[in-house]
Amino acid sequence: MNMHEKILDNLQELVYIADMETYELLYYNRALAEEFHIPQRLHGKCYEILQGRRAPCPFCTNGKLSQDGCYVWKFYNQLVGRHFLLSDSICEFNGRQVRTEIASDITEHVLLQEQLDKNLSLQNFINHCARKLYRQDADLPFLIDDVLAA
């Protein structure tokens, strides 16, 4: 194991390198191996090992990548049931063009945001009901029926 691999293996983020023509996984770090429950040096196509597919993914970012920077996106991986923030880039590795992907698990953040959205929606509904019921000149039975119908 070289120094670069040692550094990548100590990251919490999931990292892999795949050949852009063949989709062959050339490297992945320990965090990815643990998250996907795969042996440290399993060989295969990225779409097979990381997505459980038989063909390249319809959402593959190879066509969106350029030499100028990275492509950042969010994705829910059904195979492991986790949400990720992904950063993909092109580089040269052993004389070939490869995609490097770094993935941060944002599942807890996504679940928290969903809960906050539900709470905000409920709070807005309660405020709407309270405003309707607070009107002093309102017909209370009508307002109660109106609020219950909302």
Regions found by a protein language model. Give the residues of each.
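Short loop/turn elements at sensory-signaling interfaces that couple input to output
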Residues: 86-100
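PAS-associated C-terminal cap
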Residues: 1-3, 104-120
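Terminal output helix/cap of sensory domains in signal transduction proteins
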Residues: 43-76
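Short regulatory/linker helices and ligand/cofactor-binding micro-motifs at input modules
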Residues: 124-146, 150
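N-terminal capping loop/helix in small sensory signaling domains highlighted by a polar->aromatic N-x2-3-F motif
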Residues: 28-33, 144, 148
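Sensory modules in modular signal-transduction proteins
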Residues: 1-22, 124, 128
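PAS/PAS-like sensory domain cap-loop motif
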Residues: 32-43
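PAS-family and closely related small sensory beta-sandwich domains used
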Residues: 20, 27-28, 42
